[in-house]
Amino acid sequence: YVAFIASDPDVSQIRAFYSDRDLLWDDDFIGIVLDTFNDERRAYEFWVNPLGVQADSIYDDVNRRGDESWNAIWDSAGRITTEGYEVEMAIPLKQLRFSPSDSKQVWGVDFVRQFPRDRENRISNNPIDRDILCYLCQIRKLEGLADLQTSRNLEVIPMLTTTSVQNRSRSLGPWEKPGLDPDAGVDVRWGITQDLYLNATLNPDFSQVEADAPQLDINNTFSLFFPERRTFFLDGADYFDTFQNLVYTRNIADPDYGLKLTGKSGRHTYGVLTANDLSTSFIMPRSLGSNVTTLTLSNQDSGSRAVESDISIARYRLDLFDNSTIGAVFTDRRADALGYSNSVASIDAVLRPTNSDTVSIQGVYSRSENPVQLRERFGQANETSGNSLRVQYNHIDAEWDWRIGYDDIGKDFRADLGFVNRVDYKYFVTTVGRTWRADGDSFFSRIRLAADYDRTEDQSGKELEEELEFFLNMNGPAQSYLNALVGGSKTYWNGKTFDEQYNQLSMGFSPTANLGIGATLRIEDVVDFTNTRLGRSNRLGPFIRLQFGRHLQFNLSHTLQQFDVDGGRLFTANLSDLRTTYQFTAKSFLRFTLQYNDRERDQSLYLSSVQRRSKDLTAQLLYSYRFTAATRFFIGYSDASFQDDRFDSIEPINRSFFAKFTYAWQP
């Protein structure tokens, strides 16, 4: 149990709104950081805003990044008083992993308060030295909790879903007949001990209820990254993290079952995962682009169908010295029915020779068996293998930061269970930056200047890109920021080398708790990848966040891109994302999402046939009631429409009704 009394000299300035869990980051909030293994490498974070809205995350001090996707089942409450606000937390020990011990526990602990006013302020019981790179090595130790009597650490989460989907072809054929499609599944999370956990799932519902944030993909040659949101993969996901992203579970699209074991014993951290996938999709990378492909099996009677594959993943990490690690990863995906397989083996290390310096290194080997469709579509040999090497040195102190990095990724390297969207290249980068910080009444609280040089060539030695960039980052009053970028590069594409120049300016501020506004402007001479020539791109991306009272939030973002070439405007693209949420309480909300994508092209300026105009419109209405992080009810409706040159208006092609209920039973 943890309680806070947060005094405030002006209670009217407290920023507190009702929101779904893990969305309180613009508010006042307070919480506790727990390094339960006392290894100064990984910690749990629990946060609560003044209205009791909760957030939780895992902080990885080795790789210096947090994971907000992790969710624990715990209770929180908060209230605003005449003196400030008060917060209480009840965190069950079964939600934490720690070393079993007959004697007292020793944990690293930090109590932190975020105090956003004219500037962002952080208050902690631990002074943090910016010249020391590690955070967890600087927090105090809490001793106690001797002779813990652990209860049965078991969660059984049954799932019930029903959907009713209508589709029709883009040629506007007849609608499919609607019908309810109920389904059931179950997740199990068993704490065998406090430091060893087994996750299992049977017939899981891995439907993604909430829409991904849209991304503009016009004049882009590489596959886009989307975050994982599914419960089975999120628990213990950080156990599989490495310097290079070799485990990207969004590639496991439609599993029928899954089994995962993760644990930590002393200096040893380990995890294994096995699953099947009813659909086999992965990234096929090249030096200048990538595509997502899905394997299919065809026969005369049923046509083409998705191919199942079996998946195995293993990870081991050994902690060394004060804050260093070495480890290994193995992944394997195979579909014997098609003669397909991809196996990856990796060794990695993160070394901290001083308090301010980090060396990260990872070597990977892959071997693939490629079925006929990969050989015909992508020119793959029957069997391929490749290597990958990544090395990076970073220095960060209170004033200076610099890095030197080198990548060497083989032409035939593939990580079909990871997110590796570029291969066949060698890359060198160096960056140096200087930061100034000011306290008191200075207009700018932080200024950073930096320069970056990088060079990329393919494995044959052909230069693909040479780039020089300069950065300016400033933070000022009203939580304002200004980020500027000026740079240029020599870029190779389709047999030609182009001189690119680019300028970018991002600005934003939050003058009151109810308003956040900003925009990014990017003006550049950049390659037109479709037609192999240089063009002028102007891109503007404004956004606004409005809060009406404590319950209603309005978020609108837009991206406008205009691309000109000799002869006129090649295309204009507009991408809008509107999300309006009424948060009844900290547990329930009603959200409306509207996403609109409009691309208009001058067909006479293209070398190949394109649509003159294409539009996509998706809408979703979603109600959610969350009892706990794992007990939740959804009900909603979504539809999708499109338009191309065949039609004069946007035409619907999908209508979906869905409902989902999950219940966390803890016997």
Report residues per predicted region:
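Outer-membrane beta-barrel proteins
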Residues: 92-100, 132-149, 192-196, 265-267, ...
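Outer-membrane beta-barrel transmembrane domain signature of Gram-negative proteins
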Residues: 129-150, 285-352, 480-540, 545
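Structural preference for beta-rich elements and adjacent junctions enriched in aromatics
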Residues: 1-319, 324-328
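Surface-exposed extracellular loop regions of Gram-negative outer-membrane beta-barrel proteins
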Residues: 149-198, 311-375, 441, 514-515, ...
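Short, glycine/acidic-rich beta->alpha junctions
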Residues: 70, 177-184, 188-192, 251-255, ...
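Short secondary-structure boundary/capping segments
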Residues: 126, 214-219, 344-347, 376-377, ...
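Outer-envelope beta-barrel architecture signal
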Residues: 42, 85, 103-107, 150-156, ...
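Exposed, low-structure sequence patches enriched in small/polar residues
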Residues: 254, 364-667
